[in-house]
């Protein structure tokens, strides 16, 4: 079972690949399994609560459990003591040892397989059992993070940054191309810092140009940080033919005071000028960002600055989150903690401001002919449902294609087809195959 982000998902797929290679029978239905591996999330309190609910539910079914991932890395031995059904814990840098852990369990051992300082990063040689469907795959280009944002525990959970070599990443991309992947999504904690630890400088632009020769129609980049979007990187976005002009930028806030409290001083006064530069160099850019409201010390003035920033910048997509106080982070001990009700009200206001912007952005696509990657058929509404370059999986909207008898027999899940966009609402587009 997989909980949490797509980086966790890749780890889960590697564990499944190893189990499959080791001769174990895999089921995605826990009721059919004698032992359940749960790859957990511990990023924020809500994620921990979800992980614990799942674990308790399995324990109540008398399932033997292996607890893997961030929750195991975070709480370690405490989990084994509090959940008797847990036969092992596996840390974020230890999932490659899943077969050895199982063998030790079979010999009656309770296993603690957690490295305090994770150093492992998977590569193209590690078996992988993909769960995202034939057409879409995530590719982890690095693991860990060297930053110390005041609100974040990721460096403690996943260790310092470890980049894969360009050759390794391209090799896996070619493997995925042979499997029929149409969309490849590059992920790490900070994709724009890729290569800094390995090559002594950020090498995302070099990597993107190498991936331009891979026979995958769409390559999408997630988790790009502002300072890493140099003119060289933007030039690669402009020139690499299969690289989508989709920029996922976790800006978090706009006001310099809040950014300083977040320990993101490198971003001060950068946001607006950065976005203006990107728009001039990459006019077709699609912008997604994530924002945190209710951060300790965020005043009404700070929040109004963020409101103005959202209104001015006109992002295509925004994810808004209320601050979650995490033990062990600098932000947890900051003065002037914001009441939850105030943070929720601020979140709701940002969402209400963004919604008409998002709808207008969608409406601007009416009349365009775009490629759509078909992901499922909705027989109830007589539509094929997919995505165009504007929408990333899980976080954005869909394109709903009205089924035309002329083309119905030519369409299959996992294929790309040109479509004329004929309508738009707050979240989705509608279109017709052409």
UniProtKB/Swiss-Prot annotation:
UniProt subcellular location:
Cytoplasm
GO CC: one term?
cytosol
Q: Which residues take part in binding [4Fe-4S] cluster 2?
A: 145, 149, 152
Name assigned to this protein: Ribosomal protein uS12 methylthiotransferase RimO
Family, per entry: Belongs to the methylthiotransferase family. RimO subfamily.
Assign the protein's first listed, main location to one coarse class: cytoplasm
Q: Which SUPFAM superfamilies match?
A: Radical SAM enzymes (SSF102114)
Q: Which SMART domains match?
A: Elp3 (SM00729)
What CDD domains does this protein's entry cite?
Answer: Radical_SAM (cd01335)
Give every Radical SAM core domain span: 131-360
Task: Quote the NCBIfam families the UniProt record gives.
Answer: 30S ribosomal protein S12 methylthiotransferase RimO, MiaB/RimO family radical SAM methylthiotransferase
Q: Which organism is it from?
A: Prochlorococcus marinus (strain SARG / CCMP1375 / SS120)
- GO BP field: tRNA modification
């Amino acid at each position: 079972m997989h909980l949490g982000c797509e980086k966790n998902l890749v780890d889960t797929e590697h564990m499944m690949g190893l189990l499959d290679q080791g001769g174990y029978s895999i089921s995605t239905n826990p009721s059919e399994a004698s032992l359940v591996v749960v790859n957990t999330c511990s990023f924020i309190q809500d994620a921990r609560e979800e992980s614990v609910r799942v674990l308790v539910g399995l324990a109540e079914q008398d399932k033997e459990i292996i607890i893997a991932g961030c929750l195991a890395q975070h709480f370690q031995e405490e989990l084994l003591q509090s959940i008797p059904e847990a036969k092992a814990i596996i840390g974020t840098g230890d999932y490659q040892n899943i077969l050895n852990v199982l063998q030790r369990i079979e010999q009656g051992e309770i296993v603690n397989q957690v490295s305090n300082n994770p150093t492992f990063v998977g590569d193209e040689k590690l078996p992988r059992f993909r769960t995202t469907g034939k057409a879409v795959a995530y590719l982890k280009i690095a693991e860990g993070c060297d930053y110390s944002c005041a609100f974040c525990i990721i460096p403690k959970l996943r260790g310092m940054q470890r980049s894969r070599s360009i050759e390794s990443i391209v090799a896996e991309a070619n493997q995925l191309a042979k499997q029929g992947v149409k969309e490849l999504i590059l992920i790490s904690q900070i994709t724009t810092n890729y290569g800094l630890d390995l090559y002594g400088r950020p090498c995302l632009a070099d990597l993107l140009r190498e991936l331009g020769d891979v026979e995958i129609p769409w390559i999408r980049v997630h988790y790009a940080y502002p300072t890493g979007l140099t003119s060289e990187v933007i030039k690669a976005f402009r020139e690499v033919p299969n690289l989508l002009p989709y920029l996922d930028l976790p800006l978090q806030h706009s006001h310099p005071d809040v950014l300083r409290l977040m320990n993101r001083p490198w971003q001060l006064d950068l946001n607006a000028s950065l976005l203006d530069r990107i728009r001039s160099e990459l006019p077709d850019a699609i912008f997604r960002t994530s924002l945190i409201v209710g951060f300790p010390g965020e005043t009404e003035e700070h929040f109004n600055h963020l409101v103005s920033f959202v209104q001015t910048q006109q992002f295509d997509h925004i994810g808004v989150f209320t601050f979650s106080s995490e033990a062990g982070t600098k932000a947890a001990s900051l003065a002037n903690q914001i009441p939850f009700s105030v943070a929720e009200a601020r979140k709701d206001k940002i969402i209400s401001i963004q919604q008409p912007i998002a709808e207008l952005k969608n409406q601007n696509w009416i009349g365009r002919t775009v490629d759509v990657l078909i992901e499922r058929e909705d027989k109830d509404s007589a539509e094929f449902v997919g995505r165009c370059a504007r929408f990333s999986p899980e976080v954005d909207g869909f394109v709903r294609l009205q089924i035309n008898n002329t083309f119905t027999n030519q369409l299959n899940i996992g294929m790309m087809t040109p479509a004329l966009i004929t309508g738009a609402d707050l979240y989705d587009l509608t279109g017709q195959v052409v």
